[in-house]
């Protein structure tokens, strides 16, 4: 038994979509979450800067005595995950491979779309992972840089959000049967995305898929939390306005949470 928390990092609130699924599947595990909303989005930034910011988040989580770190951010996974994983002596998990694997299982026509930040799409990481496992699958990647600001400003239900999503996804409509939400912010726009793509297109939440791998690693390294513990205390940190973060988090997690501000 290991009652230390699992650490989650993201460029903002998007990683909460992963946390929500973890709380549902593994309610006995403690969580420490850090969202760098003050510097979001990461997608348009240079690789060097993304690595620097990611290491700051990692080092913060290490001060919280975490037993595992989850990159709940596709951009950070694409740019810095391998480097961090090699440097630490605790498990470090990214969201890309679980999402890629789920897309392969889902597609029936071998036509997969991937949407993400400019950096994630430019890295071509999803196409590489998907075609490494299933060379015959065709992958269409599309950067959607306007999606993260919509979520970070809590405007997911606005009319402008609907227009931006509709306009952004137009190049993929009718051309794919599976769409990977290659940014953990994007599931917060899921109803609009599904409406634009149509009911026949399967949406893959890479963050939610990641939780299955978390469970596997907890078992493999024998670091599961206390299954009998009913009341688990989580801690949430943000580098930006804690009130906005708390509002979004409370809606998504369906529970009131306390959010602490931190300066990195």
UniProtKB/Swiss-Prot annotation:
Which PROSITE patterns does the record match to this protein? ASP_GLU_RACEMASE_2
GO biological process terms, semicolon-separated: cell wall organization; peptidoglycan biosynthetic process; regulation of cell shape
Assigned EC number: 5.1.1.3
Query: Where are its TM segments located?
Result: none
Where substrate is bound, by residue? Answer: 10-11, 42-43, 74-75, 184-185
Active-site residues are: 73, 183
Q: Which UniProt keywords apply?
A: Cell shape, Cell wall biogenesis/degradation, Isomerase, Peptidoglycan synthesis
Q: Does the keyword Isomerase apply?
A: yes
Output the superkingdom of the source species: Bacteria
**Which pathway is this protein engaged in?**
Cell wall biogenesis; peptidoglycan biosynthesis
Its EC top class is isomerase
Q: Which InterPro entries does the record cross-reference, listed alphabetically?
A: Asp/Glu/hydantoin_racemase, Asp/Glu_race, Asp/Glu_racemase_AS_2, Glu_race
Please list the reactions this protein catalyses: L-glutamate = D-glutamate
Q: Which Pfam families match?
A: Asp_Glu_race
For this UniProt entry, the molecular function terms from Gene Ontology, in alphabetical order, are:
glutamate racemase activity
Family, as annotated: Belongs to the aspartate/glutamate racemases family.
The record's function comment reads:
Provides the (R)-glutamate required for cell wall biosynthesis.
Name assigned to this protein: Glutamate racemase
Q: Which organism is it from?
A: Streptococcus pyogenes serotype M4 (strain MGAS10750)
């Amino acid at each position: 038994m290991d009652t230390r928390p699992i650490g989650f990092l993201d460029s903002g609130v998007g990683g909460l979509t992963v946390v929500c699924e973890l709380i549902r599947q593994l309610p006995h595990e403690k969580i420490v979450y850090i969202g760098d909303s003050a510097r979001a989005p990461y997608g348009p930034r240079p690789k060097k800067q993304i690595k620097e910011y990611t290491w700051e988040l990692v080092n913060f989580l290490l001060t919280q005595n975490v037993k595992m770190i989850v990159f709940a951010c596709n951009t950070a996974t694409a740019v810095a995950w391998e480097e961090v994983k090699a440097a630490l002596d605790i498990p470090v998990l990214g969201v890309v491979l679980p999402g890629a694997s789920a897309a392969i299982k889902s597609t029936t026509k071998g036509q997969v779309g991937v949407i993400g930040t400019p950096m994630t799409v430019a890295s071509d990481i999803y196409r590489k992972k998907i075609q490494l496992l299933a060379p015959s699958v065709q992958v269409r990647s599309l950067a959607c840089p306007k999606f993260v600001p919509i979520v970070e400003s809590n405007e997911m239900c606005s009319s402008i959000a609907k227009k931006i999503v509709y306009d952004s996804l137009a190049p993929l409509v009718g051309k794919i049967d599976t769409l990977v939400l290659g940014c953990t912010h994007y599931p917060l726009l899921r109803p609009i995305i599904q409406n634009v793509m149509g009911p026949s297109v399967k949406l893959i939440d890479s963050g939610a898929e990641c939780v299955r791998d978390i469970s596997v690693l907890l078992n493999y390294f024998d670091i599961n939390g206390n299954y009998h513990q009913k009341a688990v205390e989580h801690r949430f940190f943000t580098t930006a306005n804690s009130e906005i973060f708390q509002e979004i988090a409370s809606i998504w997690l369906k529970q009131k949470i306390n959010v602490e501000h931190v300066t990195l």
